[in-house]
């Protein structure tokens, strides 16, 4: 019996090949896109959950508000975690990590050549107790206990030794530092908020034994015992800070923590759950750029909406097609079929369609996965698509859609009286459906909203790239490993002016396109070092060529100059710092910092530089102080217009002559600037892709419905042509109702899209306006696409021979 049902179902689907193909392709596309987005969302939600202790690990994050300056960071004082573990038995273990992304480069000797590598961290010996990453070689309990030891990941072991059995071997690091390999750990999973390639003992870091409570220079993680109450633990953290920090506040600022709080300033440290870091933390000194929970919500909604569009299409076309089968139902009933037989037949056809769609959807997902990975910046493996849990959910959803789509014709058509059906009294009422029109409106509402979102994101990215940022990022080459060249870097810089294509060059510690990681230091307005005169400013360590090389403009005063030996003790402020300090004539003012003996040292202001963006445009320009330094981490070279490629080759040749085998590792500043908005650019690309798929699915459904409508009105079209109606008139007649539905969808989409994109733009301090023309443009694009889709079928119907259509009736 079932075999017979299956054979009849397949014959029926084959008989209407066009509808069958549209139905399968539409639903498969929706399911395939939904599957890809589901993989993305699941990956984002799984961060750090590979750690079996993840739900018991917290990071201690700083929130410091001092004299109208807020400082949020993923760092804390070095003694905090140690003190908590000593004083609070609920803290089972702790680890402190020193890692700054823009300072994590490391030079390693391989063969006789120096190799530039990345992601070197310093950590306590308890690292592998808090983060139990499997070791392929070595003892996790002792691997980081000895000074000058190093633990490396599997990839690094194979890169430098072609093996993972390397415990006891030596790596030579820049500065004649020999490190003994004491462990090799598996590559850290992609869904982790850090990906260190090398880990050295914390005591080997540049901090030494800095145990000041006012220095936030490590990321501190604590592992608590099962059942620990988070609120009680937070109170313990607050009490510890008040006790120990108070002593240093009185020594340095001559104020107690209580008095400081009464003035509105505070030092707070929050417990950030490990599993929340990736999606809920966006602080200074994050190990890596984190995700955004709002994007997870947005993409989840888009996946649901695209799937709904596909399902609506599927059900729309299934019910429309079934209207032509009313007479078939009547004949089957006359021939002896029961209502149950008919219900089973219709449901089986619908389920077959949906299951075929699922198989095609998996193929679509596999084909699009490399493209999706490129657009989203993910590295989702092919095998993730075949996750049993995910496929079971999709299978269940597919069966549900098939049952819903088949239920209307199954239960409605099977209830018809044969005599009425065969007389044709039900066809007219069945063919017109307000529900079908509503579903078309819904489909194009989503499509138009996505088009508007895509245009707004594109406009904001254009605004970012065209807005004046206070420096000239064009034709600036940055060498990021200048420190590694040692003393050779100065000789290299002296030789740069001899290259005809070089305009200027600067050695500095910080670049405005590095995206964060700047030092935040306390400065005082008066020699009386106290809390009231304290300002927290961003310190940029520069030389006298920094401002001209980067094309910055002076607002007052002058730049640093070798003609003034006293400039080594001078400072340059930006306009925001002057405004914060409230100075009318800053060139007559001084700022102070304590020297080694805690006596105030004066730094006269010699100039004011115009404000420039030294972080992304999500953030407001903050107060900056520039000081002269011998820092050699970054070398920026401004190139003259002309043959850039030839000039870079000359610079590289000179670099090799002075850099003692250190590789020539460079980027261009405009590329670094673009990386600051990589996440927004990816979002824009994904929105374009989603909008294209949404429109494609909607148009497939529209094409099917127009085809159905023209089939229903074949006789009417023939009569109109016999009576002299023009082709254009008939096309307009057939398209008018559907065009009206698209316009209704546009009217609904406009306010919703405006609200959603306004909320998104609020995440930028500097943002574009939503232009009014975006809305009619999006509506016109959707209408044009819909008209092209409809015209293909309506013109064919209008050009058909009326004799043939009337004879068939």
Specify the residue positions occupied by each region the protein language model found.
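Hydrophobic, regular-secondary-structure patches
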Residues: 44, 58-119, 126, 158-163, ...
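Mid-to-C-terminal secondary-structure elements
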Residues: 124-137, 148-291, 491-679
